[in-house]
Amino acid sequence: MNRNEITTLLNFVDKTRLLFNKKITNNTVDSEWRIFSYVIKNHLDNKIITTTSIIQSSGLPFATGLRRVNKLIKEKKLIQRVKTKSGKSFSIHPSSELIEEFTLYLLSIKNEIASNLGFGELNDSYYFGMSLSAGNIIPSPKVFINSSNRFKKISLLSNDNPTFKVINSNLDFFEYILDCKIEHIIENDLNKLLNLIIKNSEKKTKSKFDIVGFNLPWVGQLAKLNTLLPLDKYIDSSGFNLRDFHFSAIRSSSYNNKLFGVPIETIPDLLFYRKDIFEKYGLSPPKKFDELLAACEILKKSNEVESPISWPARKGQPLATSFILMMANFGKPYVNLRHIGQNTYDLDTQKIVIKTNFLSEAAFKAAKVLKSLIPYSPTDLSLQSNDECVEYYSKGKSAMVMNWSSRAHQFELNKNSPAFKNSGYLPRPAGVEPFQVSPIGGFSLGIPSNILDDKIPFVMKTIQSLVSPEIIKYYIEHGSLSSPVFSVANDPEVRTLSPIFNELDKMERDERFVEWARYPLPSYSKIIEQVGNELFEFLFLNKDLQTTLEQCQKSASRLLVWLI
């Protein structure tokens, strides 16, 4: 079990014990469980806890709570660690024995539930919280009963990512399923799409759109501008099973612990590689960037392909994204988030002063690696964005490409592509351990804040249909290789369409997907555009790296003023 699944199980047991104590025993204290749950949760988040905070969490009077904590320390369930040089202040932590016992306890609960749902005990395909349809063949989409007499039309604003292309190409089908007319407005340019979403909510009149598909890193900016409606209370009353969604997808759609969108397309940035070519030259799939560069050198000498690798390097947002994702593989987000441990950073920025990391060692290394890739990349690399570099790979012109998973449809569903059924998938290679990770991208469906109040239930039901397992499967069958939910990825029919789903499911369970690489600062889009322009001059116009990164840091610092 990974950290996310343990946390979900803990929350589940918390609720069941609370229900038992309230409904059966009328005892709401349950102090020992509350202590253990509190200690384990904070340990997972690498947060310091004290004797006082544990007593407060226990629900016991202070003196009784103090005796209980001392007893648990004596029993070696908890351990003390000196916090200050004076030795008079301590932090409290779970002992290794408690962590092991607690993990085994939660695992036994998971296995019991899995067994009763028809999964074999210790079956790794069961992920706690996934839909009951997981592992089964998901049926065709069912029709939505629109009982509203007032609302017979939905207006959707989005870009042209693969999932939205499926909707637009099959409007008659979706109108039949949703029992309403659909007005689908597509804006291909991401900057223009962002501005459209913002301007729509600036108006004092009602919103022009009912649903907006927003790029995940925009959530901070859209939340700060009150552009989107917080969805938490509507989710609770609409019957959404958010636990079936990948944790990374839900977190990436949230800001300051509020949910502003429901994931419709969750896509990690991966390394695609040609298995047949790698096998031909005895190359191992690269897990580190030095291994990738070594493979590039061998492939360049072989003349097997035009270029060993392709990746997005167009000036502005595409290049900046490649840069900050590379920074993540060298162990740093582009802003100074708190490091929890391993490959995890805390997304809570309430207690820190935000600064950018463009003068960090990771930034220098990331820029240098991108520069070192240029001799192994297409001659028109500086013109390539996401679609162009995947198309290059799909035509057999490169042996590797770094890009978002959804674009795998260009070769996985194209029998004429040399990469068809010949592609392997990996998290992005590590610059330093343990950062072989893939940052999460994609789109979520949000509701404009100036929508008519009485239309919200109808719109929520529409969103629920658009992200249901049946509809997600329909997107996949029609060309969008993306699933934000566990249950669809476990459908045997879906798995036969492309090996990418098995690989993505495994990466999610192994916690290879991270949200912190593109932390959604309210000024994210402006910072990224500036950084992409500056990096372009270093990579293609030979500007000095130190000067380039100093300029990135300076321009980003000016844009951070908006946060204050």
Question: What does each model-identified segment do?
Answer:
Residues 216-269, 426:
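Hinge/lid segment of periplasmic solute-binding proteins
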Residues 117-220, 547, 555-564:
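Conserved N-terminal structural module of periplasmic/extracytoplasmic solute-binding proteins
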Residues 82-91:
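Short, Lys/Arg-rich nucleic-acid/phosphate-binding segment
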Residues 281, 375, 413-483, 514-517:
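Extracytoplasmic/periplasmic substrate-recognition and gating elements
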Residues 296-298, 338-383:
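Glycine-centered hinge/linker elements that transmit conformational signals in sensory
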Residues 45-56:
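Short acidic, hydrophobic short linear motifs in intrinsically disordered regions
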Residues 163, 438-439, 488, 502-556:
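C-terminal capping/gating helix-and-loop segments adjacent to ligand/active sites or protein-protein/ligand interfaces
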Residues 1-26:
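N-terminal leader segment of winged-helix/HTH proteins
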